[in-house]
């Protein structure tokens, strides 16, 4: 699989962080998350913060992010995934503007603090 991906120009990274992650996301054409299980998909949110087109499975955690329907494919449907990726590749590249306000760390921290303060009363 890794050899086939490399020949096709696909990068299968595994876990990365820091400068390497920044370099990958800065130079990526799109971000794909075909997971069948996720919690809050932080990697997806990171890709969105780089304004990348995204292609993600329609599992509940990804659906909660609230992307446009053309970003999703039915989990496990390899043909649908391939078609969606091909569409992204065939389109002229453009950065995508996402509503990231719900994922603002300062806002989230204040909400969590409010929960703890409420518990202490």
Provide a role label for each language-model segment.
Residues 92-120:
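A charged, aromatic-enriched C-terminal amphipathic alpha-helix characteristic of glycosyltransferases
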Residues 1-16:
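Nucleotide-activated donor-binding/catalytic signature segment of Leloir-type glycosyltransferases, i.e.
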Residues 53-56:
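Short hydrophobic beta-strand element within catalytic cores of glycosyltransferases
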Residues 34-36:
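Aromatic "clamp/platform" in nucleotide-sugar-dependent glycosyltransferases that forms part
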């Amino acid at each position: 699989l890794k050899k086939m991906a490399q020949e096709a120009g696909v990068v299968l990274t595994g876990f990365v962080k820091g400068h390497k992650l920044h370099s990958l996301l800065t130079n990526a054409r799109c971000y794909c998350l075909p997971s069948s299980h996720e919690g809050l998909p932080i990697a997806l949110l990171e890709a969105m913060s780089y304004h990348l087109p995204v292609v993600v499975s329609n599992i509940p955690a990804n659906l909660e992010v609230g992307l446009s329907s053309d970003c999703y494919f039915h989990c496990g449907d390899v043909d649908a995934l391939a078609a969606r990726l091909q569409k992204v590749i065939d389109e002229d590249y453009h950065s995508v503007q996402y509503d990231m306000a719900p994922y603002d760390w300062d806002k989230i921290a204040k909400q969590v603090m409010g929960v703890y303060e409420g518990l202490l009363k």
